[in-house]
């Protein structure tokens, strides 16, 4: 699957159970990759003051030919001077410093006759961003060190601001998470861990499966996410779990429309059947563990919405399985839907 670089807003359903209800105060915030959410990595570079601004164009051309910086196209070669005295108007980025950074003269850095150093002052070391910024916050941090180009992903910016989803879409999201909360409450009534999950086809807003934690000594792997994936499979004529002792765990049979769409949008597994959850959304009250996150990768889920984080969570807290570049499927993750309510269900995960 092609990696997901941004977040596409989808229209809300025509009708949802709570369409007259004002959504509670919560935000669906994206869980981005480590590259998108981490601090800006800096490397040392050499720069030099441009003492004669009439030489700027020539120096830029000659230095760029010798040190083209193909791995750092985001770095601008010239910046306004930050010298308090104002003795010169700009600084020119020469080259990366490498592991043996130290004081260097122009003669050591700029080979002649390829570069005529007239017009340049004494070189100095400066930290510069090693990679292009991926979010606006990274851009603001990066340009504080050195001028940097930035190609903003408006969808990511909207998602980080909590503005990606319309009021109608938020109402639908709240309805589905409330359903997961009720499933978690049913689990607690059976003496099970209070974690609930719901799988939804976002194209129709149709609930395909509702499940909760069903773990026991005999079946320790039946986490809510694993249960829901199996229930979706049962709706497709597959699945293997016997959940008759848990009436809150239910599924609906795949419709002809869903089956037809599956054939057009889903790749096939080794049995020539479509992957179980391609194109579907999962709502779960607690952040999934590593096992469940990998199951979602294999099931080809499209998006995951979770309420409260987990100490060993694999979709943001401990790991970001959904965004690993070495996996053959990645998916979008949002956190914070009805977070307080979800946290109260299972206060000591």
UniProtKB/Swiss-Prot annotation:
Its cofactor is Zn(2+). GO terms for molecular function: catalytic activity; metal ion binding. Keywords: Acetylation, Metal-binding, tRNA processing, Zinc. The keyword Metal-binding applies. The modification N-acetylmethionine is found at residue 1. It holds the Pfam family dCMP_cyt_deam_1. Residues 171-334 form the CMP/dCMP-type deaminase domain. InterPro entries: CMP_dCMP_dom, Cytidine_deaminase-like. Residues 1-25 are annotated as: Disordered. One of its GO terms (biological process) is tRNA processing. Zn(2+) binds at residues 223, 289, 292. Gene3D superfamilies: Cytidine Deaminase, domain 2. One of its GO terms (cellular component) is cytoplasm. It comes from the Eukaryota. Belongs to the cytidine and deoxycytidylate deaminase family. ADAT3 subfamily. This is Probable inactive tRNA-specific adenosine deaminase-like protein 3. It comes from Rattus norvegicus.
